C-alpha cells in the first residue's frame, strides 16, 4: 500500500565516504577508495554539496537536515561532515563516479505539501506539450544556484 504523508521535510547531500565492514574486499573497490584519497575529489565534493544544500534551503524553503538518529541510513551508514546537511556515505553512485560529486536529496517526496507540489501541473516548457510540476523547475534552479555559488567561490 501507500505510505501516509509526513510533515517532516529536509534537504541533504551525500559525498563519497563511510566505507563499512566488507565494502573494500574487491580490488576495484580499494582502487576507487584510493582514488578518492589521492585526489581533491572529497574536498571538492564536500564544498560543492555545502553550496547546493544552502541553495536548496534558500530557494526551496526546505530546511537542511542536521542529523536524525531515527533515520537508519544516517545513523548506521553515514558520517557527518563539518558542513551542515552534507554526509559521507558509500553509495555505488558516490563510490564509482570519479570527480567532484554532489548526490543531493532536495526534499522529502513523502511530505504532504511536497507531494502535492510534485503532482501539480503548473509549468510548461517551450516546445513541450504537457504541463509539468513547477517544483521540479525550482529544484533545478536550486542546483544551478548552488553550482554557480561553488564555481564563483573557487
Predicted regions and their residues:
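A short, glycine/acidic-enriched catalytic loop
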Residues: 2-40, 114-127
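Active-site-adjacent mobile loop/cap segments within catalytic or ligand-binding domains
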Residues: 3-5, 64-154
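Noncatalytic linker/hinge segments flanking ATPase motor cores
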Residues: 34-43, 146-151
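Acidic, glycine-rich loop-and-strand cores that form catalytic or ligand-binding grooves
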Residues: 37-81
Amino acid at each position: 500500500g501507500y505510505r501516509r504523508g509526513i510533515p517532516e521535510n529536509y534537504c541533504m547531500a551525500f559525498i563519497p565516504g563511510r566505507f563499512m565492514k566488507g565494502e573494500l574486499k574487491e580490488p576495484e573497490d580499494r582502487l576507487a577508495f584510493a582514488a578518492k584519497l589521492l585526489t581533491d575529489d572529497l574536498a571538492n565534493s564536500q564544498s560543492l554539496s555545502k553550496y547546493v544544500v544552502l541553495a536548496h534551503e534558500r530557494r526551496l524553503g526546505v530546511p537542511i537536515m542536521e542529523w536524525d538518529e531515527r533515520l537508519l541510513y544516517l545513523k548506521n551508514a553515514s558520517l557527518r561532515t563539518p558542513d551542515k546537511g552534507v554526509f559521507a556515505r558509500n553509495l555505488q553512485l558516490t563510490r564509482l563516479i570519479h570527480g567532484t560529486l554532489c548526490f543531493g536529496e532536495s526534499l522529502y517526496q513523502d511530505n504532504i505539501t511536497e507531494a502535492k507540489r510534485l503532482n501539480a501541473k503548473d509549468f510548461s516548457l517551450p516546445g513541450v506539450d504537457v504541463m509539468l510540476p513547477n517544483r521540479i523547475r525550482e529544484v533545478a534552479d536550486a542546483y544551478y544556484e548552488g553550482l554557480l555559488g561553488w564555481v564563483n567561490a573557487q
